[in-house]
């Protein structure tokens, strides 16, 4: 396996900065603010698919954001287990057809559009209509932790889980989360903020170890806004400590210790967007049941060879083999 030095380093690496002392108190207080079940609309859509019921869910998130999600539930007399899917940065939730694969195994699926990105969720007070990308990572970092864009997204996810868990068709004790890149980060956030999530699959998770990202000089599209903030707003890095201290409250590695359910992670060793070292800053802070798989030849790209089967097995308990069956 190539790059043995990196493989050795990632076994123990936990990130450049420690968790703020009041981190859990901050998030517990933020969750308390949204602990009441929000008003929501769940509208059924008839797509002439006889085996499932399809719904569009909308609710008001923090700071007047409007959150939209697609919901697919297999028709069943029993309560169904459910998977929350989260999409990549600047993207949108799954198409309806993408969600149907899991219903064959008896699982419901919810796919949320992140506010202000390419789907139907809206960014509220910041921009009531349309796409507000880019700048989501850095937004609010100058004003303070209460103003962070991703703080609102994380609370949207908490509320989403609460709404879905309250539905009579859903088995609230069998909830999972799944995603890649930003989606992998948000799947972990779902489990960290809401212990109802019992199982998480994260593929090359984003939003981790911001200090290391800055030191690496990551100018990929995903992290470009962090680089550009310092290049064009603070070239002497006079505010670096304050910015890093604020971003610590949305750093996924700092949420890892809160996760109680099982976690599986997949990493491409050639990833130059969400560097493997930053992903393992999350993994090595997990205290729950966990496992990972590394793909040495893969970068931050579609992982279509056996990975979808592996994820399906992890989430649904199936036993699809990882070889060509003749």
Where in the sequence are the language-model features?
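Cap/lid segment of the alpha/beta-hydrolase catalytic domain
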Residues: 94, 100-103, 107-155
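Acidic catalytic loop of the alpha/beta-hydrolase fold
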Residues: 269-274, 301
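Hydrolase active-site cap/lid region
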Residues: 189-237, 294
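Short beta-strand/loop motif that positions the catalytic acidic residue
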Residues: 258-259, 265-267
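N-terminal cap/lid segment of alpha/beta-hydrolase-fold proteins
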Residues: 33-77
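N-terminal targeting or regulatory segments adjacent to alpha/beta-hydrolase or S9 domains
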Residues: 1-52, 324-326
């Amino acid at each position: 396996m190539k790059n043995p030095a990196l493989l050795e380093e990632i076994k123990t690496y936990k990130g450049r900065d420690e968790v703020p002392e009041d981190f859990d108190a901050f998030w517990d207080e933020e969750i308390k603010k949204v602990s009441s079940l929000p008003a929501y609309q769940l509208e059924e859509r008839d797509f002439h698919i006889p085996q499932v019921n399809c719904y569009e869910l909308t609710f008001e998130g923090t700071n007047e954001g409007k959150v939209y999600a697609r919901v697919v539930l297999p028709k069943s007399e029993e309560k169904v287990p459910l998977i929350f899917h989260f999409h990549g940065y600047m993207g949108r939730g799954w198409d309806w057809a993408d969600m149907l694969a899991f219903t064959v195994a008896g699982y419901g699926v919810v796919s949320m559009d992140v506010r202000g990105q390419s789907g139907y969720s809206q960014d509220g007070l910041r921009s009531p209509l349309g796409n507000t990308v880019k700048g989501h990572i850095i937004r609010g970092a100058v004003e303070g932790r209460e103003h962070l864009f991703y703080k609102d997204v994380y609370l949207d996810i908490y509320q989403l889980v609460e709404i879905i868990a309250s539905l009579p068709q859903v088995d609230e004790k069998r909830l999972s989360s799944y995603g890649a890149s930003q989606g992998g980060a948000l799947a972990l956030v779902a489990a960290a903020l809401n212990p109802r999530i019992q199982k998480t699959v994260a593929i090359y998770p984003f939003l981790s170890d911001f200090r290391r990202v800055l030191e690496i000089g990551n100018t990929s599209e995903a992290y470009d806004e962090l680089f550009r903030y310092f290049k064009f707003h603070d070239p002497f890095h006079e505010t670096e400590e304050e910015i890093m201290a604020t971003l610590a409250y949305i750093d996924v590695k700092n949420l890892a210790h809160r996760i109680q359910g099982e976690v599986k992670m997949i990493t491409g060793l050639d990833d130059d967007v969400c560097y493997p070292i930053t992903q393992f800053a999350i993994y090595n802070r997990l205290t729950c049941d966990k496992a990972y798989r590394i793909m040495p030849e893969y970068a931050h790209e579609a992982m279509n060879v056996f990975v979808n089967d592996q994820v399906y097995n992890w989430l649904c308990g199936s036993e699809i083999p990882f070889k060509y069956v003749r």
